[in-house]
Curated annotation (Swiss-Prot):
<keyword id="KW-0813">Transport</keyword>
<keyword id="KW-0597">Phosphoprotein</keyword>
<protein>
    <recommendedName>
        <fullName>Alpha- and gamma-adaptin-binding protein p34</fullName>
    </recommendedName>
</protein>
<dbReference type="InterPro" id="IPR019341">
    <property type="entry name" value="Alpha/Gamma-adaptin-bd_p34"/>
</dbReference>
<dbReference type="GO" id="GO:0016607">
    <property type="term" value="C:nuclear speck"/>
</dbReference>
<keyword id="KW-0963">Cytoplasm</keyword>
<dbReference type="GO" id="GO:0015031">
    <property type="term" value="P:protein transport"/>
</dbReference>
<dbReference type="GO" id="GO:0005829">
    <property type="term" value="C:cytosol"/>
</dbReference>
<keyword id="KW-0653">Protein transport</keyword>
<comment type="subunit">
    <text>Associated with AP-1 and AP-2 complexes.</text>
</comment>
<feature type="compositionally biased region" description="Polar residues">
    <location>
        <begin position="201"/>
        <end position="210"/>
    </location>
</feature>
<feature type="modified residue" description="Phosphoserine">
    <location>
        <position position="310"/>
    </location>
</feature>
<feature type="modified residue" description="Phosphoserine">
    <location>
        <position position="311"/>
    </location>
</feature>
<comment type="function">
    <text>May be involved in endocytic recycling of growth factor receptors such as EGFR.</text>
</comment>
<feature type="region of interest" description="Disordered">
    <location>
        <begin position="201"/>
        <end position="229"/>
    </location>
</feature>
<dbReference type="Pfam" id="PF10199">
    <property type="entry name" value="Adaptin_binding"/>
</dbReference>
Length: 315
C-alpha cells in the first residue's frame, strides 16, 4: 500500500458475499485491478475519486478478518464499509466484533450493507436501531422499497448511495477544484439521501433556539417573506434554525475553496440531511424543496432556473 494514501476498509461478515464483490460493485467493474500483497490476504483496489468539487486517490482495502488489520492500514482508514448476512438472526453479531476497531479509527463514513433486510433474520427496525446506536448508515443493495418516481428529490439507494457517501467524504489527500458555483446541485444530491441514516445525531439531537430574533428576521425564508440577492421572494420556512443553516450554507459555498471550508460545508449538509430524514415522507419532500429554493436565492441564483423544481409552488 502506497504511503499516505487513505483507504476505505471493506469487509464482509457473510460466507456468500465477499468484500471483493462489493468493491467491484462500487468500482462498476468485474475486472478491477488488484494490487498484489505478500500474504494475499489483504487486497487493495486503487480508486480515483474525481467529481466536480475535488479529486482524491484512495484505496478500497478488502480485509477478510480483524487480525489482518495492520498498523499501517489502521492509520490509513478514513471510511468503513461492512457487509452482513441479514437472513441470519445472528447476522449483526459478527459486525459488532469490528466495533472496537472502528472506535479507534473514528472514520467519517461508516456504512452497514446487506442485500436487503429480512423479516426472518434481521428486519429493518433491528438494522436501523443498530445503526443509530453505533453511528452507521444502512444501505440495502436491492431494497424492496424504491423511491417514488414522482419524488422531486429521490433518495439514493444501493451501490449508488455507497459511492455517493464515499464521494462526500473529505479525504486527507483531497485536491480541491476551483469551481465553487455548483452548490445547488450538491444540495440536491445530498439533501435527500438515504432514509436509513444511521447517525445517533439524526434521531436524538435537538436544535437550540435561534440566538437572536433580529438575525432571524434578516435571513432568507423567514415567515414574513425574505429576498435573496436576486431580490426574489422565497417560500416561508418556519424553523428559524433552518434559516441560519441556509445562511451558513450560502456563506460556505461562495467562500474560499480551502479544505476547512469544504469540510464544514459537507458537515452542514449532513446535519440538514439527518434532520430532514426524521420527517414523514411528504414533509421531507416539502422541506427539501424549501431548502433548495432558499439556498439558491441566498447564493444569488436566478429564480427562473428553479421554477420547475416543484410541481406545487403553493406550499
Amino acid at each position: 500500500m502506497a504511503a499516505g494514501v487513505p483507504c476505505a476498509l471493506v469487509t464482509s461478515c457473510s460466507a456468500t458475499f465477499t468484500g471483493d464483490r462489493l468493491v467491484q460493485h462500487i468500482l462498476g467493474t468485474e475486472d478491477a485491478v488488484v494490487e498484489a500483497t505478500s500474504s494475499d490476504a489483504v487486497r487493495f483496489y486503487p480508486w480515483t475519486i474525481d467529481n466536480k468539487y475535488y479529486s482524491a486517490e484512495v484505496n478500497l482495502c478488502v480485509v477478510p478478518s480483524k487480525c489482518r488489520v495492520t498498523a499501517e492500514i489502521a492509520e490509513a482508514v478514513q471510511a468503513f464499509v461492512v457487509y452482513f448476512d441479514s437472513t441470519q438472526k445472528s447476522g449483526l453479531d459478527s459486525v459488532s466484533s469490528w466495533l472496537p476497531l472502528a472506535e479507534t479509527w473514528l472514520p467519517e463514513v461508516m456504512i452497514l450493507v446487506c442485500d436487503r433486510v429480512c423479516e426472518d433474520g434481521i428486519n429493518r427496525q433491528q438494522a436501523q436501531e443498530w445503526c443509530i446506536k453505533h453511528g452507521f448508515e444502512l444501505v440495502e443493495l436491492c431494497p424492496e422499497e424504491l423511491p417514488e418516481e414522482d419524488d422531486d428529490f429521490p433518495e439514493s439507494t444501493g451501490v449508488k448511495r455507497i459511492v455517493q457517501a464515499l464521494n462526500a467524504n473529505v479525504w486527507s489527500n483531497v485536491v480541491m477544484k476551483n469551481d465553487r458555483s455548483q452548490g445547488f446541485s450538491l444540495l440536491n444530491s445530498l439533501a435527500g439521501a438515504s432514509r436509513s441514516v444511521g447517525s445517533a445525531e439524526s434521531c436524538q439531537c435537538e436544535q437550540e433556539p435561534s440566538p437572536t430574533a433580529e438575525r432571524t428576521e434578516s435571513l432568507p425564508g423567514h415567515r414574513s417573506g425574505a429576498c435573496g440577492p436576486a431580490g426574489a421572494q422565497v417560500d416561508s420556512i418556519v424553523d428559524p434554525m433552518l434559516d441560519l443553516d441556509i445562511q451558513e450554507l450560502a456563506s460556505l459555498t461562495t467562500g474560499g475553496g480551502d479544505l476547512e471550508n469544504f469540510e464544514r460545508l459537507f458537515s452542514k449538509l449532513k446535519e440538514m440531511k439527518d434532520k430532514a430524514a426524521t420527517l414523514p415522507h411528504e414533509q421531507r419532500k416539502l422541506h427539501a424543496e424549501k431548502v433548495a429554493k432558499a439556498f439558491w436565492m441566498a447564493i444569488g441564483g436566478d429564480r427562473d432556473e428553479i421554477e420547475g423544481l416543484s410541481s406545487d409552488d403553493e406550499h
